[in-house]
């Protein structure tokens, strides 16, 4: 293997950039590391080049360990996004720069320079200065300079990111030709999926410092092993189905089970991936090739060049969990996405509102995992309650648990270790892949660090922290609530089951992300849900003035409409639900409804997010935690992509 990364890790302060990444790249291979911002892809490249030192792990190039070697002795060529050409040097001297450092003879430098200029399509431009070249031409020179002294490995960090679309496409083709002719082992990092698919022999998907999956582009797209990759690459229809009796059941339909699907004797819940181009949409009554998925109605269309992109409502899938596309708050019926190259005669028929029939040409089955819970404990009584309830929730979600022990003081480590040991002994039979780890220091900081390095769907707080009672938003809970991107479950008192969930849509509290997340939890647990909205006593108006009846009536209508949309969302998920409206102080009314209705869980939406001690949202959460006699789920507001 030309390049080997062996359990490489890198941290920048509390941020984990790479977490035990292992990778092998074959001789002459063009390997693409694909990931979003902050995934760790550029860090991996810099570590291979010797520009950044890893905290742990080994780097091997051409079979030789190079961790200790400086960049200039690793035999690596590096191409940056911003060209990094010497502006005072001609194109020829830029290309020769590395060869001069390596003391290559003059005649050999000229021969190699002209060979590379011809290869990159810039013959005759050796005497030009970089400022007289276009961006695409400058990047070609940067590639030639990196290849000039014949490195064993070529590393490219978003090399086409600063170029326009047309130039990027041309350069991708040129790079592929050059790489294949020279047979130089190459790693390119990018966030551009089209670029990755066009160039790569294999792709590695990086997410939060984890190398999630590696494979040829077509295999990763059509047969991913994980939900994360299925959703990350392109668009996806991802539904929950069941293999039963050797057949695949999705909603009311029975679909053809792929040959590579697991063979089971009883039944097995799975995720069903249907790419938009594999979903056949035809006018009702027309002949159809795939396996029938039912009748539907076109909701939206968009002509993107020759491809017709459609959103299609499919009533027969009502109650079937659809993981992608994400449900929209208030959506009345299940929606799938389809891409088609329709025949000319079909174009006037495939329009919004048109009744259609759907069929599946090809699909892929992914093992179903119901979610990942991070349970944080400190060996206290609160930790025991939280762990017990978290285990029940994880079991009902068909998910997995990881347990983080936190010791804020050195004399607390023994208790934390004992708690972890007892947890491993008590729950490993139910969760065979159960992992535990111990962290010392501020509980809130350690929890947030673990959330940053792992991919979790929920965090369960079973540690008090040094300040604040277990029932209030003390330092640990407050810090995690304000900064966590995943829902937080706090267990002041445990319940024996999860059959009734109260989802609060009180004034000032987010009412979309919490409805969708709590609805998914209710669907997995087979629980009923109640949507609650609290009308505050004070209405908008002049100070001291009586409430305007027209304003009050308008707010009631708005509340009813909002609750009705929430009920539609829950019904779409197959969750039995009802709505209630109370009037008064939000926290008091939530607590009274929870008590009188004997709910097993209260779900609250955090503000966007609460960032100060005086935040109304934080005050409401604090009061509910102080007096609730049941678990409380706090769902953060969704963050903008890229944050």
Predicted segments, located by residue:
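ABC ATPase nucleotide-binding domains
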Residues: 75-77, 81, 85-228
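Helix-to-loop junction immediately C-terminal to a conserved catalytic motif
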Residues: 49
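The feature captures the beta-strand-to-loop junction immediately N-terminal to the Walker
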Residues: 34-36
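Small/aliphatic-rich secondary-structure junction motif
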Residues: 370-421, 426-434, 500-549, 567-580, ...
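ATP-binding/catalytic-site motifs of ATP-hydrolyzing domains
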Residues: 58-60, 64, 210
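Non-catalytic connector elements of ABC transporters
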Residues: 236, 247-370
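Glycine-rich, Arg-bearing micro-motifs that act as flexible, cationic patches
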Residues: 461-479, 498, 601-627, 640-643
